[in-house]
Amino acid sequence: MGRLANRAAPTQAGDTMARVDTATRAAARITRVRSRVLDLPLPADFRPAWGRGEVQGSFFVTLVEIETEDGITGVTAAEAGPEAAVAIERFVTPHLVGQDGAAPERLIGVLRDAEVLGSPVYFVEVALWDIVGKLAGMPVYRLWGAATERVRAYCATGEVRTAERRVEDCRRIAADGFRAVKLRFHSDDPREDIKVVEAVRRELGDRLAILVDANQAGVLPGMGGHRQWSFQTAVNVARELERLGVVWLEEPLSRHDYAGLRRLRDRLGTLQLAGGENNHGIQEFALLVEKGCYDVLQPDAVLSEGVYQIKKIAALAEAAGLVVAPHTWTHGIGLLANLHLVASIPNTSLFEFPHEPPGWPASALSQMLVEKPWIDQDGCLAPPQRPGFGFELDEELVERYTVARFG
């Protein structure tokens, strides 16, 4: 009798949980997916180091909202124009409507299939987890374990500038409260870029940790190219940066040159190698870990994989003694998605905070949000505490700069 009684209680509890699960699925059933393409202005011309000869006065963002039966809306965005919205409408919406929006793991296959068809839409998973967080009434990073409440940010610059101007920039950056800065290497002769690092180190000493981004992972289509480094050039630059006490060198070789990256890493002492923003899919990152290419992995939650899939990548990195420090130079929603991600993992370090006035200040990156992220007095960022990813759209601004609608 005792054994039979003990079996009955779990059955009743199971029935209750089943009813709750059924109610949740009904509430989270996806009813609509809509996209708006925005052309967001920059306050001044911006000359990206990774696009020689390019001058940007604005940037495209495709804002995607996934609506559920009970009125909860999950929001995400891609740094892309109408092509992203078309991909969503063709390859994603037909497979999401009617599905359980609170079950992202069941839907990640849809996003991967779209990527196979040439349309990377991993960023959509952010909206699904936004729904989950709002249903649970919790910030996403807390749902995922809340490894920390704050992360140390570094100021990511985006242009190639003279040594004199960059020193002045770095004085301002330090005064703003940052403890680290990332500089760009894109001169035909890397020795010119090394002079900039030398000047910043000489003038600011140890007030700022220095990171360097070579952007050698691949030339972006449609943007001005830059001279690709040979393996020996990467070695020579790395040795000079090591001498100057630089923390890491980012993307010194092609993103798929696994053997070259490992050889380079094996030759270094204190300088770390970082990269991964241009790699896609959990399998590529597993290969980067297996081959020992980097000390620091830099997947982006709206570019590289689904945001929760990157949490899995972080676990692979943790097992190998590596850290994850995401790329975030996209838009404010992407920045916050990555912030929740790193706040939920134990193996992170510095967090990228794009800020290159006058052309690309942090406020421009996050202009479609009501509250613009900024560092605290310790140079750290804290994820928003509201449910989901915790941001609110500036609907007036979004409407003002919307140039196309889908769904």
Annotate the PLM regions.
Residues 27, 32-34, 67-135:
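Metal- or metallocofactor-binding catalytic centers and their adjacent structured scaffolds
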Residues 78, 155-158, 183-185, 208, ...:
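A cross-domain feature marking catalytic cores of carbohydrate-active enzymes
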Residues 123-161, 207-210:
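Glycine-rich, aromatic-flanked loop segments that form ligand/cofactor-binding clefts
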Residues 150-263, 268:
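Metal-dependent enolase-superfamily TIM-barrel catalytic cores that perform enediolate-based chemistry
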Residues 6-10, 15-73, 80-81, 86-89, ...:
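Non-catalytic terminal accessory/regulatory regions of metabolic enzymes
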Residues 30, 71, 92, 124, ...:
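Conserved, mostly hydrophobic/aromatic
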Residues 19, 25-43, 56-61, 331-407:
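Flexible C-terminal active-site loop/helix
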Residues 86, 94, 254-274, 279-380:
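Shared catalytic-loop signature of beta/alpha-barrel
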